[in-house]
Design a protein with these regions (language model features):
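Transmembrane helix-loop junctions in multipass membrane proteins, especially transporters and channels
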Residues: 38-42, 381, 678, 682
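Beta-lactam-recognizing serine transpeptidase/beta-lactamase-like catalytic domain environment
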Residues: 72-73, 78, 299-316, 325, ...
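Solvent-exposed, polar/charged alpha-helical surfaces in well-ordered, non-transmembrane soluble domains
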Residues: 90-101, 209, 213, 238-242, ...
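Amphipathic, well-packed alpha-helical segments that form the structural scaffold of globular domains
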Residues: 286, 290-293, 303-304, 334-342, ...
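Structural motif corresponding to the C-terminal cap of alpha-helices
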Residues: 336-348, 426, 599
Length: 744
């Protein structure tokens, strides 16, 4: 190769190299463009996947007693859940039929709240909503609204709409009703690719196995573990613990008076199918008990294939709520209340009207903690769902929270409040007296009476409390007026909320603003009658305030909030002073002296000889019902605190149709015995005390009512009628119809 040819070859090589470099540069620039500029778009086009996020429900926190013993807890259950994302193009109604048949074969039910019966022999449907059930009637109205029907629509109209909407005409009538109900439930639960449908809840392990065996023919049908509320001590404090339940349509979608619709629970992070506290402490402490839900992410590609499943957020359980109540003591008070009512019926109430209901509340005097809140009759939390109809139909009202919401005339238990008002205001002192001859004659034509049991003549305040002298309190009450003694009673805890965390009745103190007010009401209200009504928990709070010399604490059920994993205290309830009566001089000491002498006046009761001093006051208010002309049925009321000189607990008791308040004396002793047994470690888990009960501690079954007056201090007017005073009760003149009448 000559020199010229060599140069030509080199030039050609350089051109080829340059061309190759330019080509490589162009490819490089294109690659950069594809990867850096549009990389995400092309990656998405290449993979074409979609993420679906599903909620993993967190376990609800426990409710435990003061020792940490579980009362309410969460246990693992199993739900049958439909996942639309995984169902693909499967025939939905055909699949629903398969699931229903499997559930039926295992004795299971499924979610169906459609208030319509199965068709009768001629193919007609009827509504199953109970006429007297507000809940059912609201659900029925909501169902018609949801389906776009008028409120006058019949059950047949509703089924016709469901059959049309969900193309069910080809199915037999019974299947139309079954499938229509499930479709309606799906509508309520907003079933979609991102909202699973809970078809059946808390199914058995046998059902779980059956569903899994048929999994290949049931795509999208899953068994999902869930937390179910269970009450390990299901008869302990059921009225206060409250219940949990599904979020109702009314709570999920709220429309105000202006037609503005909001979803407050959704804004707080709830899903429509979530379980929420709906009453009692379960509701009051919802934010603490509710855990933080987790998130499961399912990734599906463009062909519909699941390519990844991951728990992207781990659920966190709710906090533990610890109560002030020791479940052993609560059981002991429950038992004592039931036995006291039984004793009253065996020994005293042998007529047609039996003592059938009552309540007892026990507080820690030092800080207002509730130690027991008993209702009789009561119910079992774990049976509530299955026996609701029986419970709600029971005339003795076992579902009614008498301890917190029952309103009762306090009778003579109100007298210490009047004594505090009179002493503290300076109207009287320890030497002041009122003459009692059994009749109060200040008013012309109206002469209310006193039993004069154990006393007569000039009576001072201590004696008046001991023997419950009506005339003393008539006169003092008239001179004070209800304006003054009501103000003191209010500060002592009567006629107002106690501060507990759950719903409670307010009550009422007789006032000049009452529609039936007349001057004589001031003397009636001074002995705890007139229009005055209070709750048992107010009576206990009142007794605790007397024991604390006028300092009233907020009454409360919750001791602390605990971390459910470590048990560490997150927050603790501190004693909170709600009101103080400073108390001039020896005001509260004089009232204490009178109250600690009351047990000695109660004959035929363990309270009269109890070795620890008890300060108490009984009440025997008349009810409006009569068992004979002029003879009214009576309630039994008691307030007490003990030990009298160094108070630890305060008690409030009411027993409907219990007769004299003195009949609750044994109940006070039984509560005291259980309390001290709890303190010294001899109180058993079932509420019984370690040592065997002796014969002296119980009332023989064949015992008859004593001939003597049980407590003259409290005897009703019909047992001490003075012929000179006439036979007309003041209560019959002034008490509104249907309200408890007076006891004199």
């Amino acid at each position: 190769m000559n020199q010229e040819e060599r140069k030509t070859a080199i030039r050609r090589m350089r051109v080829l190299v340059a061309a190759a470099c330019i080509l490589m540069l162009l490819y490089g620039l294109r690659l950069i463009f594809l990867q850096l500029v549009n990389g995400d778009d092309f990656k998405s086009q290449a993979t074409n996947t979609t993420d679906y996020k599903f909620t993993v429900t967190a376990a609800r926190g426990d409710i435990v007693d003061s020792r940490g013993e579980r009362i309410a807890t969460s246990v693992t259950g199993y739900n049958v859940v439909l996942n639309k994302l995984l169902m693909g193009d499967e025939d939905l109604d055909g699949m629903l039929q398969k699931i229903v048949e499997l559930l039926r074969a295992n004795g299971e039910s499924w979610n169906d709240t459609l208030l319509i019966s199965q068709p009768d022999a001629v193919g007609n449907y009827t509504f199953t909503a109970e006429e007297g059930s507000t809940r059912d009637q609201k659900a029925l109205a909501a169902m018609k609204d949801n389906l776009g029907l008028q409120q006058y629509a019949t059950a047949n109209d509703v089924m016709e709409k469901l059959v049309e909407d969900y193309d069910l005409a080809s199915y037999p009538l019974s299947w139309q009703r079954t499938l229509g109900g499930i479709h309606y439930e799906m509508q309520l639960q907003a079933f979609s690719n991102v909202n699973n449908f809970i078809m059946a809840e808390n199914v058995s392990e046998a059902t779980v196995a059956t569903i899994k065996e048929h999994s290949l023919s049931l795509p999208g049908v899953e068994i999902v573990e869930t937390s179910t509320r269970s009450y390990e001590q299901s008869t302990v404090l059921p009225h206060v613990l409250g219940r949990v339940g599904k979020i109702t349509a009314e709570k999920w979608k709220v429309t105000d008076e202006n037609g503005q619709t909001t979803y407050p629970l959704r804004e707080k992070g709830y899903n429509m199918n979530d379980i929420i506290g709906i009453s009692g402490l379960e509701s009051a402490y919802e934010d603490e008990l509710r855990g933080k839900d987790g998130v499961e992410t399912i990734t599906r590609n463009s062909d519909g294939v699941i390519v990844d499943t991951a728990l992207t957020t781990v659920p966190e359980p709710g906090h533990t709520v610890q109560l002030t109540i020791d479940s052993r003591f609560q059981k002991a008070v429950d038992k004592a209340l039931a036995e006291n009512i039984d004793m009253i019926n065996r020994v005293y109430n042998t007529g047609s009207m039996k003592a059938a209901a009552g309540a007892a509340v026990v507080l820690d005097v030092k800080d207002g903690s509730v130690l027991a809140a008993s209702n009789y009759p009561s119910f079992d939390q774990n049976l509530y769902a299955t026996q609701y109809s029986e419970y709600s139909a029971d005339e003795s009202l076992p579902l009614f929270n008498r301890a917190l919401q029952g309103l009762y005339t306090p009778g003579s238990t109100f007298k210490p409040a009047v004594a505090v008002a009179a002493l503290d205001s300076g109207l009287i002192n320890q030497y002041s007296t009122v003459f009692c001859n059994g009749v109060y004659t200040f008013y012309k034509g109206y002469s209310p009476r006193c039993t004069r049991h154990g006393h007569s003549g000039n009576i001072d305040v201590v004696t008046a409390i001991k023997w419950s002298c009506n005339v003393f309190f008539y006169d003092v009450g008239r001179r004070l007026t209800s304006d003054v003694y009501d103000a003191y009673a209010y500060k002592l805890g009567l006629g107002q909320r106690t501060g507990v965390e759950v719903s409670e009745a307010v009550g009422h103190l007789t006032s000049k603003n009452d529609s039936n007010y007349m001057e004589s009401l001031d003397v009636q209200a001074a002995i705890g009658q007139g229009n005055t009504v209070v709750t048992p928990i107010q009576l206990a709070t009142y007794a605790a305030t007397l024991a604390n010399n006028g300092t009233r604490y907020r009454t409360h059920f919750v001791k602390a909030i605990l971390d459910s994993n470590t048990g560490e205290v997150i927050s603790e309830t501190q004693p909170e002073v709600m009101d103080i009566i400073e108390g001039t001089g020896n005001t509260f000491e004089l009232v204490r002296q009178g109250m600690r002498q009351v047990p000695s006046t109660i004959t035929n009761s363990k309270i009269s000889s109890y070795p620890i001093a008890i300060a108490c006051k009984t009440g025997t208010p008349q009810r409006s019902e009569t068992y004979a002309p002029g003879k009214h049925y009576l309630n039994a009321i008691m307030v007490a605190y003990l030990p009298a000189d160094d108070p630890q607990i305060a008690i409030g008791i009411t027993i409907e149709y219990g007769g004299y308040g003195a009949r609750t004396g044994d109940l006070v002793v039984d509560i005291a015995n259980a309390y001290f047994a709890m303190q010294d470690g001899t109180l058993n888990e079932d509420g019984t005390i370690g040592k065997q009960e002796t014969a002296a501690d119980s009332t023989p079954a064949d015992q008859t009512a004593p001939a003597q007056t049980e407590n003259g201090a409290d005897a009703a007017a019909d047992t001490a009628t003075d012929p000179a005073a006439g036979t007309t009760d003041a209560a019959q003149e002034t008490a509104p119809a249907g309200q408890d009448a007076l006891d004199n």
